[in-house]
Amino acid sequence: MRKSVVAIVGRPNVGKSTIFNRLVGERISIVEDIPGVTRDRIYANAEWLNHTFNIIDTGGIELGDEPLLVQMRQQAEIAIDEADVIVFLLNGKEGITSADDEVAKLLFKSNKPVVVGVNKMDNPQMHETIYEYYSLGFGQPFPISGTHGLGLGDLLDEVVGHFPNESEEEKDEDTIYFSLIGRPNVGKSSLVNALLNEDRVIVSEIEGTTRDAIDTKLHRDDQDFVIIDTAGMRKRGKVYESTEKYSVLRALRAIERSDVVLVLIDAETGIREQDKRIAGYAHDAGRAIVIVVNKWDTVDSNEKAMKEFEKNIRAHFQYLDYAPVVFLSAKTKKRMHTLVPAIKLASESHTKRIPTNVLNDVIMDAIAMNPTPTLKGKRLKVLYATQVAVQPPSFVVFVNDPELMHFSYERFLENKIRDAFGFVGTPIKLFARRRQ
């Protein structure tokens, strides 16, 4: 299911970040902060009235030719473009300014639902001025106070009322859906084109559930694939690539719809901090992952160099020790033949089910090899385990006391399950539960 997106927009100093933090911290329950961007507090994944959605905090929209103002305006325009609903925030202590009118013109052009929030209405007497905000032309304005958290419930009720129909995407169970993520200029579009040119069996370009997204069908090795949101890579181009904070949103949407995520790394420039953040999105979403080192033609690409590079990847991406690493060049097509088998293997692992009796044989053998830990004289007893979900494979281990399950022992059991059943390219989730 695609999450709706809410952008908070307005001129500088109307309290956008205060409202964002108030919504994130108190008035709505945060499901999780989207990983890797917590420093900037640009995005949050949130829930209100059983609707899960993304909130975006934008920079202030301000006229001017200074590079910083142009960049902030450009970023806000991208957020508006991605949003399903826009919260237009104003400063109730200052009334409607000419700068607010300029923002309103921009929002009218978007043809998106706009909900007006008049911030800094800290006492009821100020509410008498609320009617002047009808003149903006967006319907009922909502008096709110970011400082005191007043009026936000009514505002959010209105916001979620504008969300598009959250119907489940119909996916063909026999088709593998995959996306490509990576920092700018890592070669995402080149790799898509290499896959398509090599195959030359594009059935059709199909509309994705995400607005403006084009998905591309592909058939290879007796398997149907869908490459998710190729439009995001092939059409949006430099504006999205240059404003990384906001282009991340499209990657998050693609990840949500994927079975397998290809995390692209540039062999020429090596591993960067941004690579880790991007990979973290896919890992935290529980998707199958293949690490793809592109531009392998630009470096000393012998077997020894490959092993050294993979060793470096393992050191930087310790939480992705399950992900296979594929080395290739989209430009020269070198080693392209290794990619599709890796995607298929990761997808198979992601959907694999293990019979309960076979699983418990492995668990009991593992315990015999490495006895369960004790805490304050009390020993952990593992009674039995069962698989409860796929995508990713998830297991519940029933025990006498979950508090006795140390992280290191949980990781030991997880690794034994992974090794025994060949889970490659997928995270595994293990939960200790007290037997009722």
Curated annotation (Swiss-Prot):
Domain spans labelled KH-like: 352-436
Keyword Cell inner membrane: no
Keywords, alphabetical: GTP-binding, Nucleotide-binding, Repeat, Ribosome biogenesis
GO molecular function: GTP binding; ribosome binding
Any single GO BP term: ribosome biogenesis
EngA-type G domain residues: 4-167, 176-351
Binding sites annotated in the UniProt record for GTP 1: 10-17, 57-61, 119-122
PROSITE patterns documented for this protein: G_ENGA
InterPro entries from the UniProt entry: G_ENGA, GTP-bd, GTPase_Der, KH_dom-like, KH_dom-like_a/b, P-loop_NTPase, Small_GTP-bd
Domain of life: Bacteria
Sequence positions that bind GTP 2: 182-189, 229-233, 294-297
Family: Belongs to the TRAFAC class TrmE-Era-EngA-EngB-Septin-like GTPase superfamily. EngA (Der) GTPase family.
Biological function: GTPase that plays an essential role in the late steps of ribosome biogenesis.
The protein's assembly and partners: Associates with the 50S ribosomal subunit.
Protein name per the record: GTPase Der
